């Protein structure tokens, strides 16, 4: 498959297979990677089924994770998602290459499938890792959240002189309670596994700075790219589906030969 490129001075989209697209990215040129690959659980993406033999899927993961290692800077960070079924395989692959900093639980409001003979799943794992043990970007002051003390009264720290109220903000724990994207939300795009803007915003604010380059090798709805646009980062995105690339071109205002009516936002339940 021939790779197609759509770009301006800040954003670049490559339409093609992920491993082919990696050849377009220079070694140690990326500050942050967010990757949300197909989970190998049988979902359909633009007419293609996401289902491979387990061994084949693991070998494929090893290939693109190796490419992430090649392109990310020594000070860079990587966030990888996967299903609860395949996360252990991915975790072991990454431990041989990166320094794992956190294993994050993204907890959302409800399971998409109402299970009858097991407990329904309402979370997805995120692996946060870095190429170096120290010296990586982590802007804790940019992602503070309200500390939930359970108290109705203002808590005072009497160890301080003079005594003062406890700081009401803290760095988030590794359990992120962020709602999933729903059909009626303004941010909804026609993609079956779209990730919330709030989740991507937290990742980008924590592990990159303005002007840094962020890579998403499985761009899908291009929500990572859109968050980079809002937060003044550069963005590189790969996507195999032309249907989803059109979403990216629209969301990032990139020049293309597609007519305006082809790029118009459509809302269809997936």
Tell what function each PLM region has.
Residues 264-270:
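Post-kinase regulatory C-tail/linker adjacent to protein kinase catalytic domains
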Residues 2-8, 249-263:
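Short, conserved SAM-binding/catalytic segment
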Residues 2-246:
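Core catalytic lobe of class I
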């Amino acid at each position: 498959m021939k790779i197609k490129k759509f770009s301006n001075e800040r954003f670049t989209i490559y339409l093609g297979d992920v491993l082919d697209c990696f050849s377009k990215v220079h070694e140690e040129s990326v500050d942050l990677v967010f990757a949300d690959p197909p989970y190998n659980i049988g979902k359909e993406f633009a007419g293609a089924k996401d289902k491979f033999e387990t061994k084949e899927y693991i070998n494929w993961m090893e290939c693109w994770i190796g490419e992430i290692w090649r392109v990310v800077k020594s000070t860079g960070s990587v966030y990888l998602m996967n299903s609860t079924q395949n996360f252990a395989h991915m975790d072991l692959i990454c431990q041989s290459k990166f320094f794992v900093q956190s294993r994050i639980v993204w907890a959302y409001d409800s399971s998409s499938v109402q299970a009858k003979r097991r407990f329904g799943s309402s979370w997805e794992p995120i692996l946060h890792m870095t190429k170096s043990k120290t010296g990586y970007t982590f802007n804790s002051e940019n992602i503070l959240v309200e500390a939930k003390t359970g108290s109705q009264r203002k808590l005072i720290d009497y160890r301080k002189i003079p005594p003062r109220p406890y700081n009401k903000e803290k760095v988030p724990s590794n359990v992120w309670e962020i709602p999933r994207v729903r059909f009626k939300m303004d941010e909804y795009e026609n993609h079956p596994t779209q990730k919330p803007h709030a989740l991507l915003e937290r990742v980008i604010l924590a592990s990159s700075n303005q002007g840094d380059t962020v890579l998403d090798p499985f761009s899908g709805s291009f929500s990572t790219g859109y968050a980079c646009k809002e937060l003044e980062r550069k963005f590189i995105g790969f996507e195999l589906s032309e249907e989803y690339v059109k979403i990216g071109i629209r969301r990032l205002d990139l020049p293309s030969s597609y007519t305006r009516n082809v790029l118009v936002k459509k809302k269809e339940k997936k």
